């Protein structure tokens, strides 16, 4: 973590602590604790293995918003053979990258047709570039909406590699577990469905090192874009999932 990034993280940490102090003081005085905002529109940024798959469902459930994981949404559109899915499949079959316009269109489709998005959303996996961030802002502006927070999960690459090489996934739902840090209740079996878990073929050191290098090169400018807007918050994702969650929640509650 560079000096400037560490400074920004410490500022964000102070903000989180102030929110916790306010909540404790209110409780001590017998006043009601701060409650979540009625609308939450947040972006969760973090490299593979940082804990997005663990934390995003908690945000969804706590704040009654939808979890928009762009990879899952794209696969769903392709499987359902929607107009956007058909167009995306043609591009992917030709070896191309799905355009920013299609990805923003898929997000827009969810916001318009997914009832669980009525209170807002947590966006996971998008945007990855400044043009994508700008197109997302434009689409939301047309809906008279805007992003209200961007949270980056900060963690050392070596710790990430150890996390990911032990990761287990439920293919149908995308639920993720870890052999050591977040094991399923029954070994190699999904807690909800009882179906078998798998380890992704690309969850190996060589592939992960390349993915992390790409992530860092892409994410830096996007993070700076949101820092300028005053929306960025950094959280130490090396902490236990429960501590990370409390820090996340304090950010969203303080936005009320």
From Swiss-Prot:
Domain notes: Consists of three domains, a large central CORE domain and two small peripheral domains, NMPbind and LID, which undergo movements during catalysis. The LID domain closes over the site of phosphoryl transfer upon ATP binding. Assembling and dissambling the active center during each catalytic cycle provides an effective means to prevent ATP hydrolysis.
CDD domains membership: ADK (cd01428)
Protein name: Adenylate kinase
Residues annotated to bind AMP: 70, 75, 96-98, 125-128, 132, 200, 211
Molecular function per GO: adenylate kinase activity; ATP binding
Top EC category: transferase
Species assigned in the record: Laccaria bicolor (strain S238N-H82 / ATCC MYA-4686) (Bicoloured deceiver)
Annotated region described as LID, given as residue ranges: 166-203
Binding partners and assembly: Monomer.
Intracellular or extracellular location(s): Cytoplasm, Cytosol; Mitochondrion intermembrane space
Main localisation: cytoplasm
Keywords: ATP-binding, Cytoplasm, Kinase, Mitochondrion, Nucleotide-binding, Transferase
Sequence positions that bind ATP: 49-54, 167, 176-177, 239
An example Gene Ontology CC term for this record: mitochondrial intermembrane space
């Amino acid at each position: 973590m560079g000096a400037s990034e560490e400074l920004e993280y410490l500022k964000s940490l102070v903000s989180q602590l102030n929110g916790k102090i306010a909540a404790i003081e209110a409780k001590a005085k017998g006043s009601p604790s701060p409650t979540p905002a009625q609308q939450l529109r947040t972006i969760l940024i973090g490299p593979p293995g940082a804990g997005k798959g663990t934390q995003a469902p908690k945000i969804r459930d706590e704040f009654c918003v939808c979890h928009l994981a762009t990879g899952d949404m794209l696969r769903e559109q392709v499987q359902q053979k929607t107009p956007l899915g058909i167009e995306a499949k043609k591009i992917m079959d030709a070896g191309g990258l799905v355009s920013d316009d299609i990805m923003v269109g898929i997000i827009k489709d969810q916001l318009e047709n997914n009832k669980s998005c009525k209170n807002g959303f947590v966006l996971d996996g998008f945007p990855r570039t400044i043009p994508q961030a700008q197109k997302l802002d434009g689409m939301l502006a047309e809906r008279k909406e805007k992003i209200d927070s961007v949270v980056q999960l900060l963690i050392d690459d070596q710790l990430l590699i150890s996390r990911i090489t032990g990761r287990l996934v439920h293919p149908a739902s995308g639920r993720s577990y870890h052999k050591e840090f977040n094991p399923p209740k029954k070994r190699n079996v999904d807690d909800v469905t009882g179906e078998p878990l798998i380890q992704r073929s690309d969850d190996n050191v060589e592939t992960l090192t390349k993915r992390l290098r790409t992530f860092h090169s892409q994410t830096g400018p996007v993070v700076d874009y949101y820092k300028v807007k005053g929306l960025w918050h950094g959280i130490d994702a090396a902490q236990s999932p429960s501590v990370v969650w409390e820090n996340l929640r304090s950010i969203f509650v303080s936005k009320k």
